[in-house]
UniProtKB/Swiss-Prot annotation:
Its EC number is 3.4.24.-. Transmembrane segments: none annotated. This is Snake venom metalloproteinase Ac1. Expressed by the venom gland. Its main location: secreted.
Amino acid sequence: STEFQRYMEIVIVVDHSMVKKYNGDSPKIKAWVYEMINTITEGYRDLYIDIILSGLEIWSEKDLINVEASAGNTLKSFGEWRAKDLIHRISHDNAQLLTATDFDGPTIGLAYVASMCEPKLSVGVIQDHSSVNRLVAITLAHEMAHNLGVRHDEKDCVGVVYLCIMRIPVVEDKRSYFSDCSYIQCREYISKENPPCILNKP
């Protein structure tokens, strides 16, 4: 129903390591990102959230923050940069950094939990960890869901017959769904906190 419907305007920032990885081929980078957005848009329909790509920024010359192997440090820097720079240039609700940097350990993404609309905290960082677009897209969807108050799926979540986006580790499947747990957590967060920035239809 429409009372549940929310609109999440996101900006994807592609860092300089990505530019190098794709040999400076902007059209290729854009196509890669657009394909991911199509995938997550499909997944987020289950949560009554429309995903709108408000901006795609490519750091073609150099990084505007210090992107490092520590996902935590990179996340903090990216959030601070968003609050002091990006938010003043592009109207959006949430920003995600896509990097070719290999984060420490098994980490392929990191985001703050239940932080939608917060200037420094409505962010995530994603490692471009696979040549399979869908797998990177699932990581993106996963980190964005943390921003929306969704935690990792426990074993007793309904929907384990198919792959769930919030499962750890993420495995490949034709279509990734949010589990009932994710749906309930997202609804609870939205009804309790009612983050204002995702109410307006752009």
